[in-house]
Amino acid sequence: TVAYINTEGDGRGFFEAGGSHSLESMVKEVTIDVIDPQKGVSVAERLGALDLLNGGDGNPGFYALGSGSDYTPFIQHAGIAAINIGFGGENQGGEYHTIYDTYGHYKRFKDPDMAYGIALAKIAGRIVLRLANSEVLPFEFGAWHTTVQGYLTEINALTTNMREAVEQHNAFIDKKVFSLTADPKKPFNQPIKKAIIPYVDFSSLHNALAGLKVTVDALGEKSLLSLTSKDVLNDKLMHAEKVLTFASGLSRRSW
């Protein structure tokens, strides 16, 4: 299995996509070729406009998949690249997994002329064709690297913010800020000092990501490879997601 494509809860509105970030670039490229049935522009252009309106840079994100849906065993257990796609935002919800989740309800309230169902089929179909017919699988790890780099930046910021918050909390106790500002007519429990947040050395992660960036950039030259080399590369690309899993299972949730 090369990849798993999941969709559910489709309706009118804007394209939504998430999944393995190795597939992010390919999915975004596909949305350039499909027209939004209500606006007459590409699905990508309309989604970019929404991102700008919401304060973004016009390049909407590709969310990471959680669990609780059909794609869960593929991406988290089998280590198969997976994506979840659909349209929404301009139709009411609340009927999902209820007795009202019917064809009649969908036809009346969700997508009356089935236009977005057709648009979704065009996107999913193009994704399947790209995966099936490309000489080299359309897996691109630049977005994956950028995403993981972002996670590391967030963790760095989190530890710094936590450390500063604890230092301020303890300083307030030393200066009796909490007791001096408490209402004497109300119950008051004096806060206790918190343990200092230690500094964490993330240098090994930074170095690993720097080395990975070199490899990711080198994959950009894959079109110059021989057919035999492409076959070898395809096998590695197809199993790349597996490397990100643990054979024993998730933390405190073994297989």
Range-by-range predicted roles:
Residues 1-255:
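Secretory-pathway/membrane protein signature
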